[in-house]
Amino acid sequence: MYGLLRNLLFRLPPERAHNVALGSLDVAQKLGILNTFTRQPEPCPVNVMGLEFPNPVGLAAGLDKNADHIDALGALGFGFIEVGTVTPLAQPGNPKPRMFRLPEHQAIINRMGFNNEGLEHLITNVRHRRYRGVLGINVGKNKDTPNEQSEQDYRKGIAAVYPYADYITVNVSSPNTPGLRDLQFGDSLKQLLHAIKEEQAACEQKHGRYVPVAVKIAPDMDEQGIRFVAAALLEAGLDGVIATNTTISREAVKGHVHEQEAGGLSGAPVREASVKVIQGLYAELGDRLPIIGVGGITDGDSAAEKIRAGAKLVQIYTGFIYRGPSLINEAVEAIRKEIS
């Protein structure tokens, strides 16, 4: 069924297809017929970051940037949903076209640029959701905010979403906001992590509950970079790390018509790089800091591979676009076998 729907959607421009698909999900959910086309996975509970997840397969940030579709997506069987990336102020993102399919590689190149409606819009949607599963909210900085002032945007984001999130992700790894990835390294990272923990502590005191904070990193790191990030996360006392975001490498798609398009490459070509980063992080972190693995999950084996590499949870996005909801069940069952 999904294969037929995907073939129809793939006749549309990628961003248009994205919006049509999510709108159709909303309609099906409101009509109460969504479960007719999907099968809920059997429970596979895990406890990570002090949170109980019904299963370890979540939806990665980026699909539902504004939290417009939480209820429909939450009905598909995900163990958790992550919305965003949201910035303090609404921004249009980069000029179109800014998303490109590479079906031969089960991949997508995007240079969206944190297009979103801002914190107020997202929070309104989150407050009115019916979905009561685990919800992560991914926060970023506005494009016009200089890196030296970026901590102000992250503080605003954390403070605003704190009352509504089960966990918060700080995105410092999108390749589509100029200079953003510079925040992953050196004193910039250490200073940002310090500010994040300060804001988290202030919010905990204000709201009387502890909301874990994770940082999302890029796959384009060498061993030295991975060791530095791991040490900085431990030193600051972060609660988790999401590995990884999209890659700027085109090695795996050389010769493709879209090879030279600027932006982040996601999907199957990121699988190997993501696993290497997870392995490197786990070698440094062990079980002291949980890893959420994302990047290149297109079937059960690639999901279980992330767990073998050291991840406690996984997230899907591009694979979900190519495979549909059946990927959720397949990934859950593969991970169940891996951890049993």
Curated annotation (Swiss-Prot):
SUPFAM superfamilies: FMN-linked oxidoreductases. The active site is at residue 174. The keyword Membrane applies. CDD domains: DHOD_2_like. InterPro entries: Aldolase_TIM, DHO_dehydrogenase, Dihydroorotate_DH_1_2, Dihydroorotate_DH_2, Dihydroorotate_DH_cat, Dihydroorotate_DH_CS. Gene3D superfamilies: Aldolase class I. Its EC number is 1.3.5.2. GO terms for molecular function: dihydroorotate dehydrogenase (quinone) activity. It is an enzyme of class 1 (oxidoreductase). Pathway: Pyrimidine metabolism; UMP biosynthesis via de novo pathway; orotate from (S)-dihydroorotate (quinone route): step 1/1. It is found in: Cell membrane. One of its GO terms (cellular component) is cytoplasm. Substrate binds at residues 65, 110-114, 171, 176, 245-246. Its cofactor is FMN. Binds 1 FMN per subunit. It is a peripheral membrane protein. Pfam families: DHO_dh. FMN binds at residues 61-65, 85, 138, 171, 216, 244, 267, 296, 317-318. It catalyses: (S)-dihydroorotate + a quinone = orotate + a quinol. GO terms for biological process: 'de novo' pyrimidine nucleobase biosynthetic process; 'de novo' UMP biosynthetic process. Keywords: Cell membrane, Flavoprotein, FMN, Membrane, Oxidoreductase, Pyrimidine biosynthesis. The keyword Cell membrane applies. Catalyzes the conversion of dihydroorotate to orotate with quinone as electron acceptor. Belongs to the dihydroorotate dehydrogenase family. Type 2 subfamily. Monomer. This is Dihydroorotate dehydrogenase (quinone). It comes from Marinobacter nauticus (strain ATCC 700491 / DSM 11845 / VT8).
